[in-house]
């Protein structure tokens, strides 16, 4: 369970892409359409944009191996999505404002699984 909370805390940290300094649109339309944005730390977002914000389907990839693939709203993880960790662990389920929120499944790389509900990033049942 301790490892789960470490993953949870790290997912909250990396989900705040405002920590990554913006470098710019490196392909497509990053205002209204489909485009690629690359940050100075080499984090990338490839997906849909609306009014300059991530909205709709997209993939956010960090140089250290973390990958979020799913729905975005107002540049936040929001809706259905999967966060994959470098060690092979993953969370698939509902997100709200960059936090696990609603039904989801957390799978550790060793095969352990927690399935249930999350409330603002905390497992409730």
Predicted regions and their residues:
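Glycine/tyrosine- and acidic-biased, solvent-exposed loop/turn segments at the edges of beta-strands
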Residues: 3-5, 12-125
């Amino acid at each position: 369970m301790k490892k789960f909370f470490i993953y949870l805390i790290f997912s909250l940290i990396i989900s705040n892409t405002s920590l990554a300094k913006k470098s710019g649109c490196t392909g497509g339309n990053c205002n209204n359409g489909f485009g690629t944005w690359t940050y100075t730390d080499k984090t990338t977002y490839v997906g849909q944009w609306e009014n300059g914000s991530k909205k709709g389907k997209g993939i956010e990839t960090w140089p250290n191996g973390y990958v979020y693939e799913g729905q975005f709203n107002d540049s936040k993880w929001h809706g259905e999505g999967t966060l994959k960790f470098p060690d092979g662990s993953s969370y698939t389920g509902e997100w709200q404002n960059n936090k696990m929120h609603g039904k989801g499944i957390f799978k550790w790389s060793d095969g352990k699984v927690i399935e249930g509900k999350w409330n603002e990033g905390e497992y409730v049942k």
